[in-house]
């Protein structure tokens, strides 16, 4: 039983580390996108936003992906493009 608990704790620690890595990657990408958008002329910014929104609109999510997850992604992308990090 102790071995099972130790193994589960080890796996949990691994998952936590993976989660931290993913969070760091997302944060880095947010910073990069924000910096790029801020350094673009307004018309170039709008063109990028329109292209990203168009690409999102054309994507048909897999049926196994819950609608809530798809909507969460779309909302987050819109938020990032319209109101980049302060």
From Swiss-Prot:
Protein name per Swiss-Prot or TrEMBL: Anti-adapter protein IraP
Q: Which residues cross the membrane?
A: none
Family of this protein: Belongs to the IraP family.
InterPro entries noted in UniProt: SigmaS_Anti-adapt_IraP
- How does this protein assemble? Interacts with RssB.
Please report a single Pfam family linked to this protein: Anti-adapt_IraP
Q: Where in the cell is it found?
A: Cytoplasm
Positions the record marks as coiled coil are 1-36
- Which HAMAP family does this entry report, sorted A to Z? Anti_adapt_IraP (MF_01198)
A GO cellular component annotated for this chain's UniProt record is: cytoplasm
Highest taxon above the source species: Bacteria
The UniProt entry lists the main location of this chain as: cytoplasm
The gene from which this protein is expressed is iraP
Protein task: Inhibits RpoS proteolysis by regulating RssB activity, thereby increasing the stability of the sigma stress factor RpoS especially during phosphate starvation, but also in stationary phase and during nitrogen starvation. Its effect on RpoS stability is due to its interaction with RssB, which probably blocks the interaction of RssB with RpoS, and the consequent delivery of the RssB-RpoS complex to the ClpXP protein degradation pathway.
| Keywords tagged on the record | Coiled coil, Cytoplasm, Stress response
Q: Which GO terms describe its biological process?
A: cellular response to starvation
């Amino acid at each position: 039983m102790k071995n099972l608990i130790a193994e589960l704790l080890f796996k949990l620690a691994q998952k936590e580390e993976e989660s931290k890595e993913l969070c760091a990657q997302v944060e880095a990408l947010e910073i990069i996108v924000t910096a790029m958008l801020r350094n673009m002329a307004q018309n170039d910014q709008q063109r990028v936003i329109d292209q990203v929104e168009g690409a999102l609109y054309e994507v048909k999510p897999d049926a196994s992906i819950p609608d809530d997850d798809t909507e969460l992604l779309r909302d987050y992308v819109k938020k990032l493009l319209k109101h980049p990090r302060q």
